Amino acid sequence: SAGSIYLNGKNKKVTESRNVPLEYRKTVQMVFQDPFGSLNSIHTVYHHLARPLFRHKLKNQTEMFPYIVHLLEKVGLTPGDKFAKKFPHEMSGGERQRVAIARALSLDPKIIVADEPTSMLDVSIRMDVLEIFAKMRKENNLTVLFITHDLASARYLADRIIVLKNG
């Protein structure tokens, strides 16, 4: 496939993922389908959330931990200070997906691309994750590109639904 990426009216020509401009990375964040594969098992939750903040120079060392605790609690992982110290293997799939959502929110993006974020979760957890997306859309004035095969989830969350033929 081919195409162009425009952000605020500017063409963001990208040939490789490492060439993606920092402005784009801050403005557009991803939440991936697999909560088990999107977090590195050797790092704590704190590391996963702190890394983008350090990279974009958004928080200093003293601001970092309280902000991460706040993010974790915002996505329903309480107490946040306990979750910040956990490793991915110590959490359920739903908890891991909440960490991925918190990481995406950490940079205060304008757009989140969520690629099948509920497909690998238990049915009992899916609604909780959809509620988090709905809440953050309203609270953060956020655009969510929610990619799914589940039309009921799309109908619940979306203002507009686009169905791709052979996509």
Model-predicted regions and their roles:
Residues 154-156:
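A short, surface-exposed alpha-helical micro-motif characterized by mixed small hydrophobic
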Residues 106-110:
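A short, proline-enriched helix->beta-strand linker immediately N-terminal to the Walker B motif
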Residues 62-82:
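Conserved ABC ATPase "signature" region
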Residues 101, 129:
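Hydrophobic anchor residue at the start of the ABC signature
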Residues 86-91, 95:
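Conserved ABC ATPase signature
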Residues 160:
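Short, glycine/charged-rich "phosphate-handling" switch motifs in NTP-dependent
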